[in-house]
Amino acid sequence: KIEEKDIVLEISKELRDQLMKQGAIVYMTRERDEDLSSKWDERKKRGDLYRRILMYKKYQADLYLSIHINYYSDTTEYGAEVLYNGINPQNKIFGTILMNNFKTALGSKRKLKKTDLYMYRNTTVPGVLIECGFLSNPNERYLMQKSSYQKKLSKIITDSVITYFQN
């Protein structure tokens, strides 16, 4: 069975490696198949998100990247997309750079989306949620399992981070 968490972890590790080669200091919220919630958390997902926010603050991150893969009942949906929160104007600036790079490199027709997710409301660290494609789309599911495509996605994100910090 192909699961989002496994592909996302591989993409994230590749992204970490590429960013570190560029001189970035990278903190991963996970490097194994585990979440950040504790056994005492009644609401497991909320506990995981809360601990991620604490990490952003603890490490005084300059940017956070939340990597995901979409899934939708319509299997023809495809393409990478970027979600941001309007609380911090830097979120939209970075999101625009990244979405434009996804459009150029992958031909993604999706648009930058504004969102109001829990994590974004509770941190001042600039960042975005990145949907690398659709696991529900057979073509993208096939591609996202390939190491070469994971490297390509990571390169697009890395190049976007570099552009963001150079501007």
Segments (PLM) and residue ranges:
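Active-site/binding-pocket entry motifs
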Residues: 35, 104, 135-136
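Active-site-adjacent mobile loop/cap segments within catalytic or ligand-binding domains
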Residues: 66, 73, 111-167
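Charged/polar, solvent-exposed surface patches and flexible loops
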Residues: 51, 100, 142
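Sec-exported extracytoplasmic/periplasmic mature domains
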Residues: 13-24, 31, 57-61, 99-108, ...
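Catalytic-core regions of hydrolytic enzymes
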Residues: 1-80, 84-94
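A generic structural signal for alpha->beta connector loops
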Residues: 23-24, 79, 108-109, 124-126
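Short, low-complexity, polar/charged sequence segments that are solvent-exposed and flexible
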Residues: 46-47, 83-87, 101-104, 147-151
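Active-site-adjacent substrate-binding region
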Residues: 89-114
